[in-house]
Regions:
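Short C-terminal alpha-helical element
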Residues: 12-16
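Residue-level signal for short amphipathic helical patches enriched in basic/charged
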Residues: 36, 51, 62
Length: 79
């Protein structure tokens, strides 16, 4: 049957760093990402909820970085 896929351990902190580097509040980044509930941003940043692939891609686009930097724990953000 299915196997659990490994989750990036550093994703939450990278999402937080991106928001901070862009100088955006949680409400502001939620609007730019098309997230209805800004509280989800906090949950992503605290590793309570895992963002969807579409949200991860939107973060990468907003930060103008390849998505690999978000999902590969071996890579540091190029910010």
């Amino acid at each position: 049957m299915g196997h659990a896929r490994p989750r990036p351990k550093l994703l939450a902190s990278k999402l937080f760093i991106i928001r901070q580097e862009l100088g955006l509040s949680q409400v502001q980044i939620a609007k730019r990402l098309g997230i209805q509930e800004y509280t989800n941003v906090s949950k992503y940043e605290r590793d309570i909820n895992e963002p969807t692939l579409m949200i991860v891609l939107a973060y990468a686009r907003l930060a103008e970085i390849p998505v690999e930097y978000l999902i590969d724990d071996r890579l540091d953000l190029p910010l």
